Amino acid sequence: EQVKRALETTIKKSGMDSNVHIRLIVSRGIKKTPYQSPKGTIGNPTVVIIPEYKKASDEVKEKGITLATVTTRRDHAVQDPRINSLSKHNCIAACIEADQLGVNEGLMLDPNGFVATCNSTNFFIVRSGEVWTSTGEYCLNGITRGTIIRLCKEYGIPILEKNFIPADVHSADEVFVTGTFAGVIPVISV
């Protein structure tokens, strides 16, 4: 309830009333030394609320984006890939690699070589009337991803959370990505 009130107050004070994207950051709080142990925390958690004007590109929504499979993996070796954290070194590395390859997003594989997610969006394919997405073990189980899964179930569209390989992606009928900011975006090439 406190966070909700703080969000509402921040938006009101900012004067923003449309296309507002909120970045909410919560840390354990101030430290008595730069040591990382939670034992050194003084007081309550620190909450940072950053409102910014941000609008998803209509052109991107209509024309779609390009992907390439990157060498950077999503795995538990560095951090739990299901947590939305500022410490996303592997996602940043995948983003840099995608940029070097001249594409919009990097398609990331899990440690076993199965499709996991993209560096900043969730990944789906459509094959023979079925919608496929990763198992969720190596991706942030995002809000929009969850909505797509729920809607498929509600409307009787077969939705499979499963392991699949890049070859399945290349022979898919359709490919799309999802994110809370931009919604559902078509993928025009992988």
Predicted features along the sequence, with ranges:
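Conserved alpha/beta cores of soluble small-molecule-handling proteins
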Residues: 1-107, 111-112, 150-190
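Feature captures the catalytic cores and cofactor-binding loops of soluble hydro-lyases/lyases
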Residues: 142-147
